[in-house]
């Protein structure tokens, strides 16, 4: 019961039906760009005479267009990737596979980042020593985005023995491991961009994002064919 609270603090937007009269709210409302799906929320805030403090509007010097001071950053990616490893280990265990990721606790259980890094690097030593069976490998972590969240998630990923490969190399990875041209005792990372997600209808590559954004009907999706079938874990770092 938050009826006695004068300030209600959240992270993501609060459902419109939860907004109370004459309250102060602090959260990401996703309304500053006039996102149509969230206009009912803004209308409700006005109707109920509530006051909204939006993290997105907290900027350097309090000026429009100045750098934001509150945003999802590197540590969101770090914590998310640690929990990703832990959840992945539990998923493999549920599928009947003993695996080194089971030895990674969730992010909140570490005293500090150094402890998390040491734990994950020790798991990496197990991977280097034992590798993965044919049933499990290759393990491919596919990343989207290039911002702070992705940078944080990649930092944690790189605590393990790893190699980055291209989307094209994905298609031959199993064969390359089988013939010894690529190792089986690492995890693989793939960095994907908008160019990997769509192509022109004639099959030619998308090379101009602005043209794609302006003319989406001239393009077809390719990510589901070229990337997803070869991906073990999709690490989504863009909004």
Please tell me what each predicted stretch does.
Residues 16, 20-139:
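Glycine/serine-rich phosphate-binding loop and adjoining beta1-alpha1 elements at the start
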Residues 96-232:
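Glycine-rich phosphate/diphosphate-binding loop of Rossmann-like nucleotide-binding domains
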Residues 4, 62-64, 175:
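Short secondary-structure boundary/hinge segments and terminal tails
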Residues 30, 69, 73, 142, ...:
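Glycine- and other small-residue-rich loops at beta-strand/loop junctions that grip anionic moieties
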Residues 4-33, 221-233, 239:
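Rossmann-fold NAD(P) dinucleotide-binding segment
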